[in-house]
Design a protein with these regions (language model features):
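ABC-type nucleotide-binding domain
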Residues: 240-441
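Helix-loop junctions at the membrane-solvent interface of multi-pass transporters
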Residues: 63-64, 87-90
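Pre-NBD coupling/linker segments of ABC/ABC-like ATPases
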Residues: 228-242
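An intracellular "coupling" helix at the cytosolic face of ABC transporter transmembrane type-1 domains
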Residues: 12-18, 32-45, 49, 53, ...
């Protein structure tokens, strides 16, 4: 349930929220940290619930036998508890550091796998291995350091236990000589004291696991503390509420976190229904950023982005994004069939709608020739398709259901001139009422 709740929360975050935590760190928290918390809770339920009853019961029985000898227990227990507290105080920050270094290793792994062709093209495998080795060495160093501190706990606890038992036998013998205690009572007292101290040792071992779980729980809590910038219970889009204009930018400025300067500075424009807006600019000029403000992937720094007469971030995000077909720069396809990828925007899209979208995107010609047509399997990331094929399927997916707004973010870079021209003409003729934003270099 924790993992599911965390996953739902992550999906409710804006791009800026995800950027703040980091994709690799989120994956690590969703997998490793939730497992660590789960193990800690399991250990707590099995041992921590039982141990207090053993300690309390044995302590009561020991006091009933001999109050003076029980003082030894009340000296030993705080000693062990104090060491447990000191170890927790020291190791929790160290466990957090270890997890952060695991995040770094996960980031390097992800980047290496995604950029393996570039790395090999520049013969940088050795450099990447060196960086990964350094990250792993950091994990090893911090793990050894925290392990050394945690290892103090068991020897100290057993030393206190043995000294306590020795003290009981010593002073118990004196009391037996004095006639105030019997041998049987002393034996019973030693057994009770052993139960108490062993229960404390079990708790001490549990603390090591629980300390890891506590550090992981804090990391998970950090993700939950990132508030969604868009309310999931906002208003629904009323496409009949305003015919013209459909999109308005009103003195919009935007800056990425820690970027230093604005990516977009005081931009204003209006797009009416059925119009096509072309945006051309150099690398880093803010074209893609501008496009991502329309579906409210990011919030503006100042000004308003208005769709159908209302600020986009006041809408329910699902309702807003159902009116928008968005094609990012990088074509993203998911494992499954062509049909399943095409139904991503509209779950109940019929084959007729899918084929119509594929034809508009100039993709039906090659999809129809695939081994199983719409049921052809797509490997992870579409690795069994060419760049142009992936782009055309990505474009077709955004066209399913005839969205009111279509955003093409430099999404035809892998297409030849003739195919690109045919695509633009098909969109204009097949979707005359759709407002189109085309971004290009």
């Amino acid at each position: 349930e924790l993992r599911t709740a965390l996953y739902k929360h992550i999906n409710s975050l804006s791009y800026s929220g995800i950027d703040r935590v980091g994709t690799s760190s989120i994956v690590n928290r969703l997998t490793n940290d939730t497992n660590t918390v789960q193990n800690g809770v399991n250990m707590f339920i099995r041992l921590a619930v039982r141990a207090p009853f053993l300690v309390i019961g044995a302590a009561v029985m020991a006091v009933m036998i001999d109050v003076k000898l029980s003082i030894i227990f009340f000296i030993a227990a705080p000693l062990i508890s104090g060491v447990i507290f000191l170890i927790m105080h020291k190791t929790i920050p160290m466990y957090k550091t270890t997890q952060k270094r695991l995040d770094r290793a996960a980031l390097l792994t992800r980047e290496n796998l995604e950029g393996t062709r570039v790395i090999r093209a520049f013969s940088r495998q050795g450099n990447e291995i060196k960086k990964f080795d350094e990250a792993v060495d950091g994990i090893t160093t911090s793990s050894i350091a925290v392990g050394k501190i945690s290892a103090i706990l068991n020897p100290f606890a057993f030393m206190v236990m043995n000294l306590g038992i020795a003290a009981i036998i010593w002073f118990g013998g004196i009391r037996i000589d004095a006639g105030s205690l019997t041998q049987g009572e002393l034996t019973a007292f030693v057994n009770y004291m052993t139960q108490i101290l062993l229960a404390l040792i079990v708790l001490a071992n549990l603390i090591v696991t629980f300390t890891k779980a506590f550090a992981s729980a804090n990391r998970i809590s950090e993700v939950f503390d990132v508030e969604p910038e868009v309310e999931s219970k906002g208003e629904n889009v009323d496409t009949a509420a305003s015919e013209r204009p459909i999109i308005e930018f009103k003195n919009v400025s935007f800056a990425y976190e820690n970027a230093g300067e604005d990516s977009i500075d005081n931009i204003s424009f209006t797009i009416n229904k059925g119009e096509t807006l072309g945006i051309i600019g150099g690398t880093g000029s803010g074209k893609s950023t501008l496009a991502m403000l329309i579906p409210c992937f990011y919030r503006t720094k100042s000004g308003e982005v208005v769709v159908y007469g209302k600020d986009v971030c006041k809408y329910d995000p699902d309702s807003l994004r159902r009116t928008i077909g968005y094609v990012p720069q990088k074509s993203v396809l998911f494992s499954g069939t062509v049909r399943e990828n095409m139904q991503l925007r509209k779950k109940d899209a019929s084959d007729e709608e899918i084929i119509a979208a594929l034809k508009t995107a100039q993709a039906w010609e090659f999809v129809s020739k695939l081994t199983n047509g719409l049921d052809t399997a797509i490997s992870q990331g579409g690795k069994n398709l060419s760049g142009g094929q992936k782009q055309r399927i990505s474009i077709a997916r955004a066209l399913v259901g005839n969205p009111d707004i279509l955003i093409l973010d430099d999404s035809s870079s892998a297409l030849d001139y003739a195919t690109d021209l045919a695509l633009r003409r098909a969109i204009a003729s097949d979707m005359p009422d759709t407002t189109v934003i085309m971004i290009s270099q």
